[in-house]
Curated annotation (Swiss-Prot):
GO terms under cellular component: cytosolic small ribosomal subunit
Source species taxonomy: Bacteria, Bacillati, Bacillota, Bacilli, Bacillales
Protein name as annotated: Small ribosomal subunit protein uS3
Gene: rpsC
Organism (species): Staphylococcus epidermidis (strain ATCC 35984 / DSM 28319 / BCRC 17069 / CCUG 31568 / BM 3577 / RP62A)
Residue runs in coiled coils: none
Residues annotated as domain KH type-2: 38-106
Database matches in InterPro entries: KH_dom, KH_dom-like_a/b, KH_dom_type_2, KH_sf_prok-type, Ribosomal_S3_C_sf, Ribosomal_uS3_bac-typ, Ribosomal_uS3_C, Ribosomal_uS3_CS
Described function: Binds the lower part of the 30S subunit head. Binds mRNA in the 70S ribosome, positioning it for translation.
Cited CDD domains: KH-II_30S_S3 (cd02412)
Subunit structure: Part of the 30S ribosomal subunit. Forms a tight complex with proteins S10 and S14.
Family statement: Belongs to the universal ribosomal protein uS3 family.
UniProt keyword annotation of rRNA-binding present: yes
Length: 217
């Protein structure tokens, strides 16, 4: 199953935390849809800002949003102008008080979503699918990744029959729950149709911390 399931979902509650932290009973569906609306809005507003993922916390009538990005300066803007505009738009969208925290991603070459989107952008600019994958793998390994696997699928090079080609380096232990594996997929719109891009990056092992109050050592 480790080969098929989403590596992030498999590790939630083991070495990964939830990206949405709130509890609701009867309002669960409406709040979940609001979360999806917020994430879609942020992705559209910050298309060029290299946003990896968004964490959402709720408390009463307040929403705390953490934006993990490779370009914090673009999100914040000069003197905080851009982030203030974004906050006002989100306040209007949700009709709640929104607080935004921007977190910088130090190593963008070992963040799966940023790597996948970078490959997709290059494919849209007619770059060679083999070259962009090999370049992404080289950069990731230089920046401390223990292993990486990339896959591009679709009408590669304009071929009549769609196929998938993947490249890898190092190890990517998908079955090991303590392995910190980041995964993402992206799409590239080319003249021959869509190409799918998948990226798995192994960043080393994470040992779950034991709770000493429950008898752990």
């Amino acid at each position: 199953m480790g080969q098929k399931i989403n590596p992030i979902g498999l590790r939630v509650g083991v070495i990964r935390d939830w990206e949405a932290k709130w509890y609701a009973e009867k309002d669960f569906a409406s709040l979940l849809h609001e979360d999806l609306k917020i994430r879609k809005f942020i992705d559209n507003e910050l298309k060029e800002a290299s946003v990896s993922h968004v964490d959402i916390e709720r408390a009463a009538n307040r929403i705390n949003i953490a934006i993990h990005t490779g370009k914090p300066g673009m999100v914040i803007g000069k003197g905080g102008s851009e982030i203030e505009k974004l906050r006002n738009k989100l306040n209007t969208l949700t009709d709640k008080k929104v607080h935004i925290n921007v977190i910088e991603i130090k190593k963008i070459d070992i963040d799966a979503r940023l790597v996948a989107e970078n490959i997709a952008r290059q494919l849209e600019n007619r770059a060679s699918f083999r070259r962009v994958q090999k370049q992404a793998i080289t950069r990731a390994m230089k920046n401390g990744a223990k292993g990486i696997k990339t896959q591009v699928s679709g009408r590669l090079g304009g071929a009549d029959i769609a196929r998938a080609e993947q490249y890898s380096e190092g190890t990517v232990p998908l079955h090991t729950l303590r392995a910190d594996i980041d995964y993402a997929h992206a799409e590239a719109d080319t003249t021959y149709g869509k190409l799918g891009v998948k990226v798995w990056i192994y960043r080393g092992e994470v040992l779950p911390t034991k709770n000493t109050s429950e008898g752990g050592k």
